[in-house]
Amino acid sequence: LAMAQTAPPSRAPFIIAPTVEGLMVCDEATQNLALLALDKVLADCQARKAHGAAALKRLLDTLEPGGPKGQVQVGYTATLELLKLYRHTPKGWVIDDAKVSALLDLIAQVPRPVVLYLSAGHFDSQGAIVAELEKDPANWMQLADGKPPALGYFGYRILPYTLRTDASIPVNRYRFEALRYVARRVKALPKAVQERIVAFTLAGELHHLFPDFENGMGAFQNIRVTDYHPASVADFRRWLAREYGSVQTLQERTGLAYPDWDSVPAPAKD
C-alpha cells in the first residue's frame, strides 16, 4: 500500500535544441541595407551592444508557441567559438569580454532551455588569432606523410589543429584559457539563468581527417584517422611504456618484438 501511494519520480523534460546560426545578428543591423557583409553586421551589433535575442524568441515561438512547457520543450544550441573570442592588444592576445557578455546576455533574455556548445575544433577557424597560430607547426596535426590535411567544407575553412593535449602548445593554451574563462563567467550568472543551460557540449567531429570530405561521405577505405606529428608519435610511445612497463612485457602480451620503445612504430594500417 505504501509503495502504491508513492508518487513516481519526476522526469526531466525532453529538450529539442536545434543549432541556431546568427545569434549575434540584431534586428537593428538587419534593417540597415547598407550592411551587406556578415562581419559588418556583427560589428554593428557589437557596437550597439545588441544581439539576436528578439529574433531568436520569434523563431522558437513558431516552433513552440507560448514558451517552453510540458515534457517536450523547444530550446536551442548556442555555439561559442573559443579561439574567435581573442582580440589583439599591445600586450598580446586577450579574450574580448564583450563577446562573451553578449552571448550570456542573450541567454538571460531568452527564457528557453539552451545547450551551450563550446567549440574549439577545426571549424573554429575564423578568429583573428588564427593567422598567428598558423605560423607554428606545433599547432597542427600531421598525417602519415608528414603533412597536415588541407581541406575545406563547402567554402568554410577547416584547420587541422593538433590532437595532442599538451597545454604548452599555443593553440591548446589559448583554448584552455578561454574554456576556463567561460566557465568562470557562467558560474557567476544568476541561478535562474544558469538553470536555463541544460547541457554543455564540447562535441568534435573528424571532418578534417576525411579524404575529399565534401564528396567522400561514403568512403570507407584509405581513411587517414590519426595524428602522426612526431610529438604525437612520442606521446603514443610514452603511453605504451606506462601501459606495459617494458618492451619485454609488450612482447609477452602482443608477440611484437622491439629492442626499445623508440623502435615501436605508430599504428599505420587501415
Regions found by a protein language model. Give the residues of each.
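Aromatic-lined substrate-binding rim segments of carbohydrate-active enzymes
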Residues: K49-L159, A167-P190
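Polysaccharide-binding and catalytic clefts of secreted carbohydrate-active enzymes
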Residues: D136-D270
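Boundary/entry segment of secreted carbohydrate-active catalytic domains
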Residues: Q5-L80
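Beta-sheet entry/capping signal
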Residues: A12-F14, Q73-G75, P113-V115, R196-T201
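Serine/threonine-rich low-complexity intrinsically disordered regions
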Residues: D27, N32, A37, H51-G52, ...
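Short acidic/His/Gly/Ser-rich catalytic and metal-binding motifs that mark active-site loops
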Residues: D27, S125-A128, L209-D212
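Active-site beta-loop-alpha junctions enriched in small/polar residues
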Residues: T19-L23, E81-L83, S119-F123, L202-H207
